[in-house]
């Protein structure tokens, strides 16, 4: 088997043909793993407010607290809490609790989440020219 083509950065964008060639370059086992990961990611990001939460981190500088997200998003507190837990469990956010009174918890995007941030930039760029 030949080596798969170099994977361009997500911000570079791929034509349909390039994406197909890249996908087809993997052995069936690896291709199945990749497609399963994409499906799992889409399931997670398709949940209420998950995209909005990650988008906040994509354009934020540094950590965010629950209260920051609650102030910026029109999300129910219980939904926001659930999404933060799920995003943390998925390895997209780190949660740090500080031993203070009142208690303070901060969330920070992981490198795994930061690798998705160009996608949010593309979505915002797309929205400049398109409405739904």
For the regions a language model picked out, list residue spans one by one.
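Alpha-helical linker/hinge and terminal dimerization helices associated
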Residues: 90, 119-131
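N-terminal leader segment of winged-helix/HTH proteins
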Residues: 1-45
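Residue-level recognition of specific faces of alpha-helices
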Residues: 41, 50-56, 83, 115, ...
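N- and C-terminal low-complexity/disordered segments
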Residues: 10-13, 59-61, 94
């Amino acid at each position: 088997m030949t080596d798969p083509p170099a994977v361009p950065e997500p911000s570079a964008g791929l034509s349909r043909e390039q994406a197909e060639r890249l996908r087809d370059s993997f052995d069936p086992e690896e291709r199945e793993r990749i497609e399963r990961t994409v499906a799992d990611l889409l399931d997670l990001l398709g949940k209420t407010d998950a995209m909005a939460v990650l988008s906040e981190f994509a354009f934020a500088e540094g950590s965010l607290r629950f209260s920051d997200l609650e102030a910026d998003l029109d999300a129910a507190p219980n939904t926001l809490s659930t999404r933060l837990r799920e995003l943390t469990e998925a390895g997209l956010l780190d949660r740090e609790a500080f031993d203070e009174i009142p208690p303070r918890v901060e969330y920070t995007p992981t490198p795994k989440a930061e690798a998705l941030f160009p996608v949010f930039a593309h979505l915002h760029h797309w929205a400049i020219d398109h409405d739904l």
